[in-house]
Amino acid sequence: LGLYCGLRREEILGLKWDCVFLDAQAPYLSVRRAWHTEHNRPVVLDELKTKASRRDIPIPCPLADCLRATKEKSSSEFVIANSDGEPLSYTQFQRLWKYITTRSTKERTYVRYINGQKIRHTITPVLGEKAAHNSTVIYSLDFQVTPHQLRHTYITNLIYAGVDPKTVQYLAGHENSKVTMDIYAKVKYNNPDVLSAVVNNALSSVYGNSVNS
């Protein structure tokens, strides 16, 4: 939901099935609720971060298929729920997210106590290998991932695909267009070759071919 729809963490954890329209000709979801916690207890409100947060987002086919399979097995009104069908507490979310981060190849340090002495043990996981302490864990991520990174990747992919800034702003739920444009400029023109072509084309239209001489 972060990678394919650009939802914020609070929007993902507050999403209910009544806002997921998988049977529509073009499946989409509506962002209408937000999750937060108070003393580790989940609270889901109809009040969103900003007016721009209220939006309808197309659901790409791979995610739509995944959501259909999930919905068939779900007895909760929430898309992401705990074993009781309730929204996740902060601790439950952290535990769930750790399932993903343990698959990262990021170097990590463990502390052991041997004969009362603290010993630091550092490991550097190798992509594709199984974890020594748990053979069910395969290191499949060569980067450290956060919910915000998934959302940022969604926005970046839209920009790379040529989606116009105003549409990106709407889909991302940005209240301020400056936020969108800052990302747009950083992504779109971070490549010197692309930037050179843009500048040359712009100046050629004004000064003619003399700009290339």
Regions found by a protein language model. Name each.
Residues 2-35:
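Short, charged phosphate-coordinating catalytic segments
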